[in-house]
């Protein structure tokens, strides 16, 4: 018998929970009820799952004892890789893995990418992204087939900075500063532009047809802000719930955008 005070981790292939729209993805609610009853002695159960090839932390208010880490793929998205494809997951996360440790009952998870070790984000100068979108012929094909997908070539994205922070956990704060002045940051669910041009556009070049599963693409850990200028550097700071600085880097603008973007 496992003592009720122990830290419990449950590993599954498919996510037990998913995002706000789909909640349980492939799992029937009755199965979650069974798991909840099975672990009723434990105050907290950490779920580790895969399948989705993306990085996502989820909780469900109906099942407060569980939290879940949807893990990225070590291959990125190997099923659709091509010669021009970086090792990326569909949400733009760099391919990698999570190292979990427990100290005094407290769980800690660290993301490790294959190529860049502890890299936790990618920042985009949306002026450069917009220029790419406006001038690429395959983007025009995509706009025709998928009018509801993000069109980063539009004026509304001018001077914006996007930060895909796949290390995000609840309580983390993403702050952006332009020449020392803070910018208003919002969390969005917009798709990752690098994954789009690396995977979706080459696929359209091969077979320009509509696929229902590609009609809506999101990244759950994307943050956006509009800068005051087009060229000033933007400092990125990430802190945890206690205000401890976790990461700091500077986005130098203009920053080139193409399939080799880092």
Residue ranges and their predicted role:
Residues 114-117, 189-193, 252-255:
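A short, sequence-level motif marking secondary-structure junctions
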Residues 1-69, 98:
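His/acidic metal-ligating clusters that form di-metal
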Residues 170-199:
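Extended low-complexity, serine/threonine- and proline-enriched intrinsically disordered segments
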Residues 57-59, 185, 248:
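Residue-level detector of high-confidence beta-strand sites
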Residues 193-226:
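Aromatic sugar-binding surface patches on proteins
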Residues 243-262:
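Short beta-strand elements
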Residues 27, 128-130, 194, 254:
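Flexible, surface-exposed loop regions and adjacent strand-edge segments
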Residues 62-168, 172-179, 218-229, 233-241, ...:
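Binuclear metal-dependent phosphoesterase catalytic core
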């Amino acid at each position: 018998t496992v003592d009720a005070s122990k830290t419990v981790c449950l590993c599954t292939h498919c996510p037990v929970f998913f995002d706000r729209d789909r909640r349980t993805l492939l799992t029937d609610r009755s199965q979650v009820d069974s798991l909840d009853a099975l672990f009723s002695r434990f105050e907290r159960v950490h779920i580790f799952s895969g399948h989705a090839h993306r990085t996502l932390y989820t909780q469900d208010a109906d099942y407060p004892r569980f939290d879940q880490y949807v893990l990225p793929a070590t291959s990125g998205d190997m099923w659709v890789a091509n010669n021009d494809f970086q090792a990326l997951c569909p949400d733009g996360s760099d391919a990698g893995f999570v190292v979990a440790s427990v100290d005094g009952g407290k769980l800690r998870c660290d993301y490790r990418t294959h190529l860049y070790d502890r890299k936790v984000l990618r920042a985009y100068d949306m002026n450069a992204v917009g220029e790419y979108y406006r001038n690429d012929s395959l983007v025009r094909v995509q706009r025709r087939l998928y009018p509801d997908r993000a069109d980063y070539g539009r004026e509304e994205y001018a001077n914006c900075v996007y930060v895909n922070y796949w290390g995000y956990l609840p309580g983390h704060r993403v702050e952006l500063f332009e020449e020392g002045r803070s910018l208003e940051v919002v969390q969005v669910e917009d798709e990752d532009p690098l994954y789009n041009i690396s995977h979706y556009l080459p696929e359209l070049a091969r077979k320009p047809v509509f696929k229902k599963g590609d009609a809506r693409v999101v990244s759950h850990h994307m943050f956006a802000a509009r800068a005051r200028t087009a060229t000033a550097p933007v400092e990125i700071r990430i802190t945890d719930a206690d205000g401890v600085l976790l990461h700091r880097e500077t986005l130098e603008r203009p920053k080139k955008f193409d399939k080799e973007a880092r």
